[in-house]
């Protein structure tokens, strides 16, 4: 599973004279890099015949796992603690 992320030139003041480029993992749907670990793991389970994946998370890991599962045609269940923020809960439900 490949998800392109944009490259942006870093502001000159960040690394003067270097010409630094940034790979912006925060610029895709999930807004985090966690999908890079979740996607191949979910795909491995799918290729072994899994129908669903289950994880426990308070945010980005759970969202990435659910995202990867949906794109692999699998069902996902994410357990979150009662203390999870409403923002993270909304992300998990997406």
Outline where the language-model segments fall.
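PLP-dependent amino-acid enzyme catalytic core
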Residues: 1-94
């Amino acid at each position: 599973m490949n998800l392109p992320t944009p490259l942006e030139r870093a502001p000159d003041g960040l690394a003067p004279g270097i010409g630094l480029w940034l790979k912006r993992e925060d610029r895709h749907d999930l807004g985090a890099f966690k999908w890079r670990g979740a996607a191949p793991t979910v795909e491995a389970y799918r290729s072994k015949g899994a129908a669903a994946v289950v994880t426990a998370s308070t945010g980005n890991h759970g969202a990435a796992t659910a995202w990867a599962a949906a794109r692999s045609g699998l069902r996902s269940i994410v357990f979150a603690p009662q203390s999870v923020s409403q923002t993270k809960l909304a992300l998990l439900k997406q």
